[in-house]
């Protein structure tokens, strides 16, 4: 079973204007064993077309529990 465990860190380096073209990118930062499964940290970056900085950078946590 997979669970959204929350966020470690969320930043908004640049404003995203309405109508902007964006894209998301995910990168696995870490994976560690926890009781009954594994916890994975994924860094999600929202890029704005033509922007120098991303609109959002967030480290999300997911837990996968195995039975």
List each language-model region with its residue ranges.
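Short, basic/aromatic beta-hairpin or loop at an interaction surface
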Residues: 1-4
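HotDog/MaoC-like acyl-thioester-processing domains
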Residues: 12, 16-67
